[in-house]
Amino acid sequence: MTDHREVVVVRWRGQTASVEDGLAALLTAYHLRTEAEKGEAVAEASDLPDRYRAEITDPWTAFADDAVLVAFQGDTAVGCLVVTSPSEGRSEIKRLWTDPGFRGRGVASALLGAAFAHAAENGAETVRLSVWEWRSDAVALYERLGFTVTESWEERKQLVSMQRAV
């Protein structure tokens, strides 16, 4: 198992093509997998709903008010996460994805640690997220990192809402 210290997390600012290319691939994989798990499989990114395609093709605009974090092992983008700007003392974590070939190597933990630090530095007292109930490995990771299930703010069924202090 690779130690998570080998993972480097950077905040994506739209400044380099290599990071952007890696981010687009990660977001594409995230959305295609999520749609398939929801029973709404699509063959390629161009078949995704407009709002998801916009995140892939123009993340600078889609996440204009948010921090986009990208994890690297060497020169390879292996994970991503979006953390929203704090509102009412709370930030939300979205789009956490680790390339399946790099899972179990601390990538998600490194991204979440960077997200917690970013949220705290920007005035958040808590972070929250929602996760599909069938993603039991993700739910277990969040629980290990101190998240607890809370009342849902989501209207979509099968989403588990969780939060923790930063």
Predicted regions and their residues:
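C-terminal "cap" of GNAT-fold acetyltransferases
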Residues: T2-V10, E125-V166
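Glycine-rich ATP-binding loop(s) of histidine-kinase-like ATPases
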Residues: R103
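Conserved G/P- and acidic residue-centered "switch" motifs that form tight phosphate/ATP-binding loops
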Residues: G106
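Acetyl-CoA-dependent GNAT
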Residues: H4-K94, D99-P100, L112-A114, H118, ...
